[in-house]
């Protein structure tokens, strides 16, 4: 994990435990993304703001959130993104949201893939965490130099394919990781 400069931390999303487990693993300030409506809650709003969270409109009007994310990355910050956009319903990795590739290509920040196994401890349908083993695994940074170079010269209609390729490569890197406890 780069200790300085911009970095996107891209992780699968299994439970409410994911942001603190990922964020507490780094020795630098982290910015988070959070559903916009959580900021209007009297309890979660101030808490999320204190964590440098970026409000994201999950209804599709994400241009404002994207602008804030890119600004924070330009200021050499680290930001955690959950490409799936929401927690899994069944513990399996879901497909990523459309804007992730755009964020990756435009930011020019390296992407650190992270795989979490927290579903059994506090999955979507669980109110209280269960004391079971969890795992968090960090991959090597992905730089996307060639995709970013192509994006700078390709015709506009081809950009969507490059964004999708960045998204697919990120999700494949996350899905390919296996927990340490699986090793003999």
Predicted segments, located by residue:
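Short, Lys/Arg-rich amphipathic segments at extreme N-termini
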Residues: 1-4, 176
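Catalytic core of membrane glycerolipid acyltransferases/transacylases, capturing the structured
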Residues: 3-61, 68
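Non-catalytic C-terminal accessory region of glycerolipid acyltransferases
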Residues: 64-184
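Generic signal for short, ordered secondary-structure residues
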Residues: 1, 26-27, 48, 82-83, ...
């Amino acid at each position: 994990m780069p200790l300085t400069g911009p970095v996107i931390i891209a992780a699968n999303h299994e439970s409410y435990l994911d942001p603190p487990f990922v964020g507490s693993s780094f020795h630098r300030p982290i910015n988070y993304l959070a559903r916009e409506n959580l900021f209007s809650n009297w309890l979660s709003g101030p808490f999320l703001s204190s964590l440098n969270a970026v409000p994201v409109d999950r209804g599709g009007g994400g241009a404002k959130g994207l602008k804030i994310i890119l600004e924070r990355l330009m200021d050499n910050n680290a930001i955690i993104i959950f490409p799936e956009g929401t927690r899994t319903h069944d513990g399996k990795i879901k497909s990523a949201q459309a804007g992730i590739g755009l964020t990756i290509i435009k930011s020019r920040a390296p992407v650190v893939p992270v795989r979490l196994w927290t579903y059994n401890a506090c999955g979507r349908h669980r109110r209280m965490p269960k004391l079971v083993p969890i795992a968090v695994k960090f991959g090597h940074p992905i730089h996307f130099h060639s995709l970013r170079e192509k994006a700078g010269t390709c015709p506009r209609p081809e950009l969507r394919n490059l964004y999708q390729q960045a998204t697919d490569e990120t999700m494949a890197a996350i899905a390919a990781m296996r927990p340490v406890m699986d090793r003999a």
